[in-house]
Amino acid sequence: MPRSLKKGPFIDDHLLKKVETQNDKGTKNVIKTWSRRSTIIPEMLGHTIAVHDGRKHVPVFVTEAMVGHKLGEFALTRTFKGHEKDDRKSRRR
């Protein structure tokens, strides 16, 4: 169930402050955050936000197509190594 429109998008206050101060100064430094739950808003366009994936911070460059999505959608937490091959050549006897 999506969030109610009357509430507006959720974004952590500390992340919003960092974005606003960089917009006021006109700088585009990397913003490091653990807030995967924050929604991407138009004020974040052009910024690089390093989102924590549980192990390291993944740099995410915010584009116009990302507005409305969550930051955590762009920093994957699981790595798929692939299934074991199932043919006779790869089996050990």
Swiss-Prot record:
It holds the Pfam family Ribosomal_S19. One of its GO terms (biological process) is translation. One of its GO terms (molecular function) is structural constituent of ribosome. InterPro entries: Ribosomal_uS19, Ribosomal_uS19_bac-type, Ribosomal_uS19_CS, Ribosomal_uS19_SF. Coiled coil: none annotated. One of its GO terms (cellular component) is cytoplasm. Keywords: Ribonucleoprotein, Ribosomal protein, RNA-binding, rRNA-binding. HAMAP family: Ribosomal_uS19. NCBIfam families: rpsS_bact. Belongs to the universal ribosomal protein uS19 family. Protein S19 forms a complex with S13 that binds strongly to the 16S ribosomal RNA. This is Small ribosomal subunit protein uS19.
